[in-house]
Curated annotation (Swiss-Prot):
Residues 110-130 are annotated as: Disordered. Pfam families: Ribosomal_L21p. It comes from Cyanothece sp. (strain PCC 7425 / ATCC 29141). InterPro entries: bL21-like (IPR028909), bL21-like_sf (IPR036164), Ribosomal_bL21 (IPR001787), Ribosomal_bL21_CS (IPR018258). GO terms for biological process: translation. Belongs to the bacterial ribosomal protein bL21 family. This is Large ribosomal subunit protein bL21. Keywords: Ribonucleoprotein, Ribosomal protein, RNA-binding, rRNA-binding. Residues 112-130 have a biased composition (Low complexity). The keyword Ribosomal protein applies. NCBIfam families: L21 (TIGR00061). One of its GO terms (cellular component) is cytoplasm. This protein binds to 23S rRNA in the presence of protein L20. One of its GO terms (molecular function) is rRNA binding.
Amino acid sequence: MTYAIVATAGKQFRVEPGRFYDVDRMNVEPEQTVSLDQVLLVHDGDTIAVGQPLVEGATVEATVMQHLRGRKVIVYKMRPKKKTRKKQGHRQELTRLMINAIHLNGSSAKTAAQPAADEAVAANEVDSEA
């Protein structure tokens, strides 16, 4: 299983190819590709590359799916014995990213879909030989 730990907007996320994640709002239009360069760790199934603090030459390629707003969080402030109450709501602006690939030193790390595709190609070659 291939995964990476990336830092974006002051938070760290464990990301895998083919999955989507909600991060703080990015100034990128939907359907555009972004490259996340702050990669802290890369695991490609066999080896683990740990950065000091970042992994050299590692990037994560993602596509912006959409911009959305998170669930409403209610903030309630009250001063006892003063009849002072303040109720406020907040919805965080988010961007949904689909992780396309994890690149390490210019080469794409294996994704979960690639081994299955390789096996399907090998099965087709065996069938065509028979």
